[in-house]
Amino acid sequence: MTIPDVPTQTLPDEGEIGFVHIGSLTTEAGAVIDDVHIAVQRWGELSPTRDNVVVVLHALTGDSHVTGPAGPGHPTGGWWDEMVGPGAPIDTDRWCAVATNVLGGCRGSTGPSSRTRDGKPWGSRFPRISIRDQVEADIAALAALGIDEVAAVVGGSMGGARALEWIVGHPSRVRAGLLLAVGARATADQIGTQCTQIAAIKSDPNWQGGDYHDTGRTPDAGLAIARRFAHLTYRGEVELDTRFGNDAQLDEDPANSGRYAVQSYLEYQGVKLVERFDAGSYVVLTEALNSHDVGRARGGVRKALRSCPVPVVVGGITSDRLYPLRLQQELAEQLPGCAELQVVDSICGHDGFLVESEAVGEMIRKTLLLAGSQSAGPGGAGPGSRKGTTRR
């Protein structure tokens, strides 16, 4: 994606991509990323008091295109189409939905495939970043747009990790949050599976130490294998067995070099990602997920969570293998502003936060009720003092 010479410093037209220049960013680890741009989209009108912004935060391979058809700059349709629009859970007749492409991504924001001032891609020079760094970049982009406080942050998976960092690190900037399919820190299981995905990419000869962007050779095979592995953690075990079992793929015979149906499905998922995503961004963002720990430098997870007054709804999925329900239960128990833990009974696994539209829509509506009940700041537990668990 080409960034225009003059970046947008006002919100773009509805559904269009704008590019906000935030200057240099110093990461949590002390590295400096110069000339940072953040891609932004919005739906709905900003109120005169600028108090109706709902920040929608995407997952690992998502982008700012939350809703709308595929088109120029949008290789795929919106990833949460049913959640944003007139009359939708994020009702754009009332709310202004704003989404960024995350720092380190490859859909308009500065990342490994972006060119530096020397005209060359960042490649291996792009530093490791954290979820916290991503949030700092988002906050800087919104500040450049004249938005210093938001009504709510909502997100699942990596987007949920970003939402958690928002409410813990910047409670005065956000009135409510929705934390979907996420935990307070990365688990050993997550780190193990994600390190294996990174290894698959880096073992591809075309990786070239991360400096492949101008060579005409890209680590597509490694990225596709990483995606296949990841996709297994995104879907539910019962769902996969119900859909595919041990069936062969159409007229192929696995006993004679043919494929299983589930094998073909995973290969297709890998090919789809390679067509739209950069391997360098996949590595950088996965490393950020591995380092996720809301308690780092805050006295540990419990202390960090207990210090956060922001009203929240926490959502989990019964069949989530990547972020199992116990992680959302911990968030609900430790966050004093948690109004409700909503548990979605679904066979779809971690991806339930993307496909269980009715249940997720209800969570968003409840989150925005919390946002609407707050004044200029979180100001205590408020509605969050009434904790409960709802199963859907």
UniProtKB/Swiss-Prot annotation:
Main EC class the enzyme belongs to: transferase
Subcellular location per the Swiss-Prot or TrEMBL entry: Cytoplasm
Keyword check for Transferase: yes
MF-aspect GO terms: homoserine O-acetyltransferase activity
Residues that coordinate or bind substrate: 227, 351
Location of region: Disordered: 373-392
Residues annotated as the enzyme's active site: 157, 320, 350
Tree of life domain: Bacteria
Reaction(s) catalysed (UniProt annotation): L-homoserine + acetyl-CoA = O-acetyl-L-homoserine + CoA
Transmembrane spans: none
Coiled-coil residues: none
Record keywords: Acyltransferase, Amino-acid biosynthesis, Cytoplasm, Methionine biosynthesis, Transferase
Pfam families referenced in this protein's UniProt entry, alphabetically: Abhydrolase_1
Domain AB hydrolase-1, chain residue ranges per copy: 52-356
GO biological process: homoserine metabolic process; methionine biosynthetic process
EC number, UniProt record: 2.3.1.31
KW Nuclease (keyword) present: no
GO cellular component: cytoplasm
NCBIfam families: homoserO_Ac_trn (TIGR01392), PRK00175.1 (NF001209)
Subunit annotation: Homodimer.
Entries under PANTHER family matching the protein: HOMOSERINE O-ACETYLTRANSFERASE
Protein name per UniProt: Homoserine O-acetyltransferase
Organism in which the protein naturally occurs: Mycolicibacterium paratuberculosis (strain ATCC BAA-968 / K-10)
